[in-house]
Amino acid sequence: MSKEIAKKRIEELRDLLNTFNYQYHVLDNPSVSDAEYDRDMQELIKLEAENPEFMSEDSPSIRVGGTVLDIFEKVTHKSPMLSLGNAFNEGDLRDFDRRVHQGIDDANVRYICELKIDGLAVSLHYEKGRFIQGATRGDGITGEDITQNLKTIKAIPLRLNEEVTLEARGEAYMPKRSFVKLNEEKEQNGEDVFANPRNAAAGSIRQLDPKIAAKRNLSMFVYGLANVEEKTIPSHSESLDFLGELGFKTNPNRRTCETIEDVIAYVEEWQEKRPHLDYEIDGIVIKVDDVAIQESLGTTAKSPRWAIAYKFPAEEVVTRLTGIELSVGRTGVVTPTAELEPVRVAGTIVRRASLHNEDLIREKDIRIGDYVVVKKAGDIIPEVVNVIFDKRTGEEEEYHMPTHCPACESELVRLEEEVALRCINPTCPAQIREGLIHFVSRNAMNIDGLGERVITQLFDADYIRTFADLYSLTKEQLLELERFGEKSATNLVQAIENSKENSLERLLFGLGIRHVGAKAARTFAEHFETMDELVKATEEELKTINEIGEKMAQSVVTYFDNEDVLELLQQFKEYGVNMAYKGIKIADLQNVESYFAGKTVVLTGKLEVMGRSEAKKKIEALGGKVTGSVSKSTDLLVAGEAAGSKLAQAEKHNVEVWNEERFLQELNK
């Protein structure tokens, strides 16, 4: 390929990938599959490596993470990043309104209300449309240069839709589902977990290695325009519209309010809706919309007089910690859990809260009998915030982690660079039981009627010890168990039989190979098509697959380099368990009669087995249309985890709602 052709192709790929990023991460309406995006990205990376003279600082390839830094350089903000004054109740809001009206002659003041994202405030500098620098807020005067890490956030445009010079400000955050997934991975790996999504976002964005930030699935909402050359915008609401037109992601839930009564109604509305968002908010920001009035009101040394932050009441309660129980996960990690006197937190009754590891118990000086403050991290996971030391009587008991596994009494170990204690006995009954529960779960073999309770009964009766044992179960054995009758036993035997027909990716995920989640299992299944081919793969072969890193490749090779595992696979074959990929390929979908033909479909939330862009591609290949919002013309909403407000919209318009499992069933017909 000549240099001229290479340069032209590089420019084409950059434009394409920038468009795809904008559609997916800002509009929430992807137009291509993950596979197509990955192919284009790999082609761009290859061409740039072969032609380094054409490398550009705003190339989408930068998003995978660049060179490891030694230190973050300091940056002085052109204008201070001021903090906001706080309001904690309705009276504080009315006082703010009164002060605003006292400061101006015009009695008509319009406010704009926005959700206060609980993340990390950053500034973004663009020169002639190109992203040149990003910095943390720091102390408001001086921040840190985190440009390389911000370039990994796909919601931040590297090039704007206009060649404009400006500074935008916003909040980088971690979605709740990403927070849960990250902590699960850290816990399985015996690492310290993050206390909440805000800490996770801040910790990720301040990594000296941008590749780590790139893996953390951060996002960002831009909430303001600090300055823009050669352009005057009369209101804050219009500046947000302008930022959206340039390609920034702005929060869609903002609202202009004509009176303080409207502001209070908005605050009350989002206090109720808050738990349904896939990101954390800790309040509402209220600003005077008119820029001329903002300038007239001015600022104090610390904060603007024309804006205030209403802070939601903390979702924290006090209860007594009555005990600490231990659980052994399928990877052998021993996790302490606080047993609590039942208490309502964020709308649900909480009886337990994870203590994660021994270091956390020591750090917080948690003792049995203590009164503790409890909240839900990310409005999801109950956690012990701190001990109320003033309530101690002297009768509280210090807790010491055991030296041996509570399930098998093998000695516990702490692996290098891990904070968790781990049982490394491969025959540990607790690990085997947890592995069996995972194997039959919804995203794995999906055996209806075979949940934790039944697995425990079968395990205790010594009917199952390996995954393959499930396929030798008889109706007679099931009838011996509590709560099993003729019909339920027959149904379960049939459900187990049906699971033999699952596609390869479900079996792979069910095996519980360390570091291999549902998405990676599907990637392996599509790539190799059969279990035999995957078993033969080398670490080098695995690492050539997009998004498969060294750690996962090593884990897969190690897993299959085990005689017991190979024996298990042989037993699966003898029982007739399918070990080939049966999923759909786009090319196979053309000219197929389908439910989706002529229908308008909306995808929302996180789809575990299939990414949304891939789902969109398959629906369109079957004659359907995928849109980004729910309306009267919508025929179907496919709702994954953390579906959010679109579920409520679907109910309002009487739109049919499917979960991911139902959606996959229809695709596989």
Curated annotation (Swiss-Prot):
Residue span, BRCT domain: 591-669
InterPro entries xrefs: BRCT_dom (IPR001357), BRCT_dom_sf (IPR036420), DisA/LigA_HHH (IPR041663), DNA_ligase (IPR001679), DNA_ligase_AS (IPR018239), DNA_ligase_CS (IPR033136), DNAligase_adenylation (IPR013839), DNAligase_N (IPR013840)
Any one Gene Ontology molecular-function term assigned to this protein's record: DNA ligase (NAD+) activity
Catalytic residues identified in the record: K116 (n6-amp-lysine intermediate)
EC number: 6.5.1.2
Binding residue positions for NAD(+): D34, A35, E36, Y37, D38, S83, L84, E114, R137, E171, K287, K311
Reaction(s) this enzyme catalyzes, per UniProt: NAD(+) + (deoxyribonucleotide)n-3'-hydroxyl + 5'-phospho-(deoxyribonucleotide)m = (deoxyribonucleotide)n+m + AMP + beta-nicotinamide D-nucleotide
Names of required cofactors: Mg(2+); Mn(2+)
PANTHER family according to UniProt: CHROMOSOME TRANSMISSION FIDELITY FACTOR 18 (PTHR23389), DNA LIGASE (PTHR23389:SF9)
HAMAP family reported in the protein's UniProt record: DNA_ligase_A
Official protein name in the record: DNA ligase
Organism: Bacillus mycoides (strain KBAB4) (Bacillus weihenstephanensis)
Gene responsible for this protein: ligA
